[in-house]
Every structure is written in structure tokens, then in C-alpha cells.
């Protein structure tokens, strides 16, 4: 009788780094990174309008990450939350459902010049788009040393963060 295997039973990933030239390739890389994440996803973007963040499939991948991790953390920071509010109801529903694990911030004034979207999974794997207006990006798996400066960059951007979207609606 076959037994299900956990993602942790998967064979080790060979370290790699690739340059991606299309938004479609980046969208596939985002899905792969979400699938690889075990504890923490750090996401910085201008507004999440590119890369398929509004799709049901992406929301399901994010939900799977949040369910399977023991103490998951999804840290999302954007310059502008309007597109997220209007076009990503599934992600906002995940924020409400997993309020303790999902934080959405808006960048502070000090970080508004940052224009190179990042997605970092567990400090080991990443997608780094060189500039939001260009489709080129670096995609790396099992490269914690290459990821380290990007984690630092994300943390610097995160430190400027202001409350973006709340998981709860308060009011009278």
C-alpha cells in the first residue's frame, strides 16, 4: 500500500541560478517558490499587479503553504495596496483566515524608491526582478549565500513598513 510522502521527503534540490526573461516564466517561478517554502515567504512588489497574484491557483498555493507549515510567516510589502484590495480578494481572504501568519504592509517613504520586486522562500530560494518595468529576473534555488543580501534588502524595506491592509475590519 502506497503511503503519502511529505514535501520534506522530496529529494534534495540541486543549487541553481537562472535568468528569466518573461513575466510568464516569473509567474511559474513564483509558484515553484511557494511550493518549496516551508516556513517563511517574504514578498516585496510595487503592487502585485504582475505575476498572477490575483488567480485562484495562486491563492490555493498560498493557502497550501499556510496550512502545511508549522508556524508559517507570509510577509508582504507593497508600495500601493489599491490593486491588491480591488483585484486579489482571495489573498485578502487568506489574510483574514490566517491573520496570525500573514502581514501586509505598505512601504514607508524611505523605501518608495525600491523598484526591484523580490520573493524569498526560507532565506534559501528567491526570485529577484531587476526592475518592475522590465521582465528580467534572477531565479535561484538552494542558494542561501546569494539570498542573504536580498534578505537584508527585504528587511530594510520591511523596516520602513506602515500598516497596509488589516485582517480585521474595526468600526462601529
Residue ranges and their predicted role:
Residues 1-35:
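Domain-start "cap" segments at the beginnings of catalytic or binding domains
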Residues 2-10, 20, 131-172:
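Signature of lipid phosphatidyltransferase scaffolds
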Residues 5, 10, 27, 47-56, ...:
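N- and C-terminal low-complexity/disordered segments
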Residues 17-23, 85-95, 118-132, 150-163:
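Short secondary-structure transition/capping segments
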Residues 24-27, 31, 59, 63, ...:
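Short, well-ordered alpha-helical scaffold segments within catalytic/effector domains
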Residues 33-98:
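Primarily the HKD phosphodiesterase
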Residues 41, 103-147:
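HKD (HxKxxxxD) catalytic microenvironment of the phospholipase D
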